């Protein structure tokens, strides 16, 4: 079908987003052009600024437009002595929304995967080791994903922490709140049973 080259280019560009196929990209493009051109302009400006100005925090490697992000530069967070290791900046947002963690973070931007040629230095573990050696840390909380690669990465970091006398802990995995046991997979249920705790009154 003959169409505007710019429109085709817009739809192709939108397809770089996760989960966006040809139909979704077409719907987005037509919606912006037909109903919300001002919103499209705001999106374009925000995207241009974000792509050119957002980099990585020098301490934790999350996304920020500053040299050091707001979390790492917070004195109260620095005094906490805890670092939570996560695989992506999106994990920080998820944990921050709980309001249960008041320490700082370290973002791996992935996980160990020897089959894909991803080793310790590729996910910044050399920089994490520098922090273990130079900072007064009381605990490193390992919040990598509950996958084979995530577990292997957590175990590697735990061994690294032991070399520097820093306590390492792993976030609990188990039955989701509101879930039914019959719907939970065997691996998750095994983790739940192994990680059970006593009820105190």
From Swiss-Prot:
Keyword field: DNA damage, DNA recombination, DNA repair, Metal-binding, Zinc, Zinc-finger
Entry keyword annotation includes Repeat: no
Every Toprim domain range: 81-176
One Pfam family it belongs to: RecR_C
Gene3D superfamilies found in the cross-reference section: 3.40.1360.10, 6.10.250.240, RecR Domain 1 (1.10.8.420)
Zn finger residue spans: C4-type: 57-72
MF terms (GO), sorted A to Z: DNA binding; zinc ion binding
One GO BP: DNA repair
Superkingdom, taxonomy of origin: Bacteria
Family of this protein: Belongs to the RecR family.
NCBIfam families in the cross-refs: recR
Name the UniProt record assigns to this protein: Recombination protein RecR
């Amino acid at each position: 079908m003959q169409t505007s080259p710019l429109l085709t280019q817009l739809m192709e560009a939108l397809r770089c987003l996760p989960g966006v196929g040809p139909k979704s990209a077409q719907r987005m493009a037509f919606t912006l052009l037909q109903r919300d051109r001002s919103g499209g302009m705001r999106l374009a400006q925000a995207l241009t600024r974000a792509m050119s100005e957002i980099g990585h925090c020098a301490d934790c490697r999350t996304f920020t437009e500053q040299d050091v992000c707001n979390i790492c530069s917070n004195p109260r967070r620095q005094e906490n002595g805890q670092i939570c290791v996560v695989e992506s900046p999106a994990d920080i947002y998820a944990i921050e929304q709980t309001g249960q963690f008041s320490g700082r973070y370290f973002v791996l931007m992935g996980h160990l995967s020897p089959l894909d040629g991803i080793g310790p230095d590729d996910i910044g573990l050399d920089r994490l080791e520098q922090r273990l050696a130079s900072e007064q840390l009381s605990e490193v909380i390992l919040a990598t994903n509950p996958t084979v690669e995530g577990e292997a990465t957590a175990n590697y970091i735990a061994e690294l922490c032991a070399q520097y006398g820093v306590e390492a802990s792993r976030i609990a995995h188990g039955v989701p709140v509101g879930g039914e046991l019959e719907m939970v997979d065997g691996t998750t249920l095994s983790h739940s049973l192994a990680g059970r705790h006593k009820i105190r009154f």
